Amino acid sequence: MMAVITEARATARYVSVSPRKTRLVIDQVRGLQAEKALAVLKFLPNKPAEAVYKTIASAVANAEENLGLSRNDLVVSEIRADEGPRRQWRRFGARGRFKPITRKTSHITVVLTEKVS
């Protein structure tokens, strides 16, 4: 007998925001219903909020299209921001020196499950 899949995933990779700042945003929506999480993220002013919003919206669309689940029954069961590769380059400074610059990236993963009634 095959198990019924009731979880939808979405991943945003190489997002140009630091994982630390992204984790501050995702801690606010972990465990919420998907619709409520999207409403909360819509009004957050942080840059990572937009990337997290898009990833959760993508997971909701995956659940509706691929699994036929209702968006009202979905809960953010797992959400995480992992470190992506760092882009490094240098700016030239005074006296022949250079200043290294590092741009951090994140991989955002969202797992939605169906709410148990």
Report each predicted region and the residues it spans.
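Structured, basic alpha/beta domains of bacterial-type, RNA-associated proteins
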Residues: 2-17, 23-28, 32-117
